[in-house]
C-alpha cells in the first residue's frame, strides 16, 4: 500500500512534467513568434523591393507602345508576373513557417489573365441546337474573338456595340460573357435585359439554363434547387452570393435592380423608347451602373428602321469597326460589301408559264475591289481566319462598335452566298421582304424611300418676313401652317 511519501513523490513528478510541458510550450511559442516576425520582415522587404521596381518594370513593359489598349494589356501582364514572383519568393523566405508561406503565395496569386474567348474555348460546351455541337471553338467564328475579348475584365473597353445580321453568333458571344463572369470572375453581379418579360421567360431563361447544364464548371456553381425554383425567373444566384438579374425592357420595375457593374442588352433595337411612364429604358439601365468605374456594357442587336434604331445610333457613336478579309488572289484587305461587289447568276424555270416564272440563283461570288478577281465562297474559311477588324474612328478607345453582315457567315453555320442572293431576288417588288432582308441579312438599317426634302437644303431657304412688310407690299393673303408626321 503506497505510503504518504510515495504520494508526495508522485505529485512532485507530475508537477515536474507539467512544468516542463509549460516551459517547452513557452519556448515553442517564443520561437514561433520569432519565426513569424522574421517571416513578416522578409515579406515586407520583398514588397518594398517590388514597389521600388514597379516604375522601371512598367516603363520596360510598354516601351514605345502608343496604342492605349495594348498599353493596358501590357501593364496588366507586368503586374500579374510581379505578383506571381512575390508569392514564390515569399514562400521560399518563410521556410520556417511553410504554412504561412504557402498561404501568402496563394493569397497574392492573381486570377489568370483569361479573356472571354479563351474561357469559352476551355469551358463552353454546346450539345444541341447548333450545326457544330461539342466544345466551343472560337476559330469557327473568328470575327467574334475581338468582340468577346473587349468584355474581358482587363480590357479597357467599357462599351461594346454589335450591329449584326442574324445567325452570326452574336447572342452566343453574350452567353460566353455570362459564363466568364460566373466562373472566372465569380463575384460580379450582372444585369441581362431582353425586349420583354415574355421573351425572357420564353427564350432567355431556357437558353441560360441549357448553357449552365451543358457546362460542368457552371452547373457546379448553381444548385439544382435554385434552378428549378419558381421565384428564380428574375434572378439567378450562384457562387458566393453573386447574381444574374434578368429583366425586360418593357418593365420599369424589372429594371430597378441593385447597382451592377456589368450589363448585357440583347436586341436593343426592339426596346421601347419609353417604359411605364418613366422614360427611356436605356437611361434606367445606365443608372444601375453609375457607382462603378470599371463597368462594362454590351449592346447587341439586328437593326431596324433608320432614325429610330437604337443599335445604329449606338454604333455611330462608337469607333465603327468592320471586319476586313484578304483577297485570296492579291492579298489586299477589304470588308465584304453586298451592294457593290457581290455578284450572282440566275436561271429562269422554262417549264413554267411566263407569268409564273421564278428566278433561281444558281451561282454567287464576290469580286475583289482591288484586283477584280472572282472570290468563291470556298475561300471564305481561310479569309475569315486571316481577317481583322478595322476602325473608321480609331481614336475612340473605350467604345468599340462592330458591324457585320450575313456574307461572313461561316460555311456550314449559316446561309450560303447562293441563299443570300436568292433571298435578295425573292424580296424584289415586296417592301416588307426587302426590309427584312436589309435588317436581318445585311445587318443595316432600313431606309424608307420617298421624296422628302433634305433638312440642310430646306433650312438654307429659310427667310424672315415681318407681317408689316408683307402687308405694305399687299402680298399677305393668309397664313397657313401644317405638319407631316
Label the model's feature ranges.
Residues 94-483:
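Phosphate/NTP-binding elements of NTP-utilizing enzymes
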Amino acid at each position: 500500500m503506497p505510503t504518504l511519501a510515495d504520494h508526495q513523490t508522485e505529485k512532485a513528478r507530475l508537477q515536474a512534467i507539467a512544468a516542463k510541458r509549460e516551459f517547452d510550450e513557452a519556448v515553442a511559442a517564443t520561437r514561433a513568434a520569432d519565426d513569424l516576425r522574421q517571416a513578416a520582415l522578409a515579406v515586407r522587404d520583398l514588397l518594398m523591393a517590388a514597389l521600388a521596381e514597379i516604375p522601371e518594370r512598367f516603363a520596360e513593359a510598354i516601351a514605345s507602345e502608343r496604342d492605349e489598349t495594348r498599353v493596358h494589356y501590357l501593364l496588366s501582364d507586368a503586374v500579374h508576373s510581379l505578383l506571381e514572383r512575390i508569392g514564390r519568393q515569399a514562400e521560399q523566405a518563410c521556410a520556417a513557417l511553410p504554412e504561412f508561406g504557402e498561404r501568402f503565395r496563394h493569397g497574392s496569386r492573381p486570377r489568370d489573365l483569361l479573356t472571354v474567348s479563351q474561357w469559352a474555348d476551355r469551358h463552353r460546351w454546346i450539345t444541341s441546337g447548333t450545326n457544330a455541337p461539342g466544345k466551343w471553338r472560337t476559330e469557327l467564328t473568328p470575327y467574334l474573338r475581338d468582340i468577346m475579348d473587349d468584355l474581358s475584365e482587363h480590357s479597357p473597353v467599357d462599351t461594346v456595340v454589335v450591329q449584326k445580321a442574324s445567325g452570326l453568333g452574336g447572342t452566343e458571344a453574350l452567353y460566353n460573357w455570362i459564363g466568364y463572369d460566373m466562373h472566372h470572375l465569380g463575384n460580379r453581379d450582372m444585369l441581362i435585359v431582353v425586349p420583354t418579360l415574355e421573351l425572357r421567360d420564353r427564350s432567355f431563361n431556357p437558353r441560360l439554363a441549357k448553357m449552365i447544364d451543358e457546362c460542368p464548371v457552371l452547373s457546379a456553381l448553381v444548385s439544382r434547387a435554385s434552378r428549378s425554383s419558381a421565384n428564380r425567373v428574375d434572378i439567378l444566384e450562384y457562387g458566393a452570393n453573386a447574381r444574374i438579374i434578368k429583366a425586360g425592357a418593357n418593365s420599369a420595375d424589372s429594371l430597378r435592380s441593385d447597382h451592377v457593374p456589368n450589363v448585357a442588352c440583347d436586341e436593343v433595337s426592339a426596346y421601347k423608347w419609353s417604359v411605364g411612364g418613366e422614360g427611356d429604358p436605356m437611361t434606367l439601365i445606365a443608372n444601375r451602373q453609375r457607382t462603378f468605374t470599371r463597368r462594362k456594357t454590351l449592346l447587341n442587336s439586328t437593326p431596324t428602321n433608320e432614325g429610330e434604331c437604337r443599335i445604329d445610333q449606338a454604333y455611330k457613336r462608337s469607333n465603327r469597326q468592320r471586319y476586313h478579309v484578304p483577297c485570296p488572289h492579291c492579298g489586299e484587305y477589304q470588308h465584304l460589301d453586298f451592294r457593290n461587289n457581290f455578284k450572282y447568276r440566275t436561271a429562269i424555270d422554262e417549264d413554267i408559264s411566263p407569268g409564273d416564272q421564278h428566278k433561281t440563283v444558281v451561282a454567287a461570288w464576290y469580286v475583289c475591289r482591288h484586283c477584280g478577281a472572282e472570290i468563291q465562297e470556298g475561300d471564305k474559311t481561310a479569309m475569315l481566319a486571316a481577317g481583322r477588324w478595322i476602325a473608321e474612328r480609331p481614336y475612340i478607345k473605350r467604345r468599340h462598335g462592330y458591324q457585320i453582315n450575313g456574307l461572313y457567315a461561316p460555311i456550314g453555320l449559316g446561309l450560303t452566298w447562293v441563299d443570300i442572293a436568292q433571298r435578295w431576288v425573292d424580296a424584289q417588288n415586296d417592301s416588307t421582304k426587302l426590309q427584312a432582308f436589309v435588317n436581318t441579312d445585311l445587318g443595316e438599317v432600313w431606309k424608307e424611300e420617298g421624296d422628302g426634302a433634305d433638312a440642310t437644303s430646306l433650312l438654307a431657304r429659310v427667310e424672315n418676313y415681318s407681317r408689316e412688310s408683307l402687308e405694305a407690299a399687299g402680298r399677305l393673303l393668309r397664313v397657313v401652317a401644317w405638319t407631316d408626321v
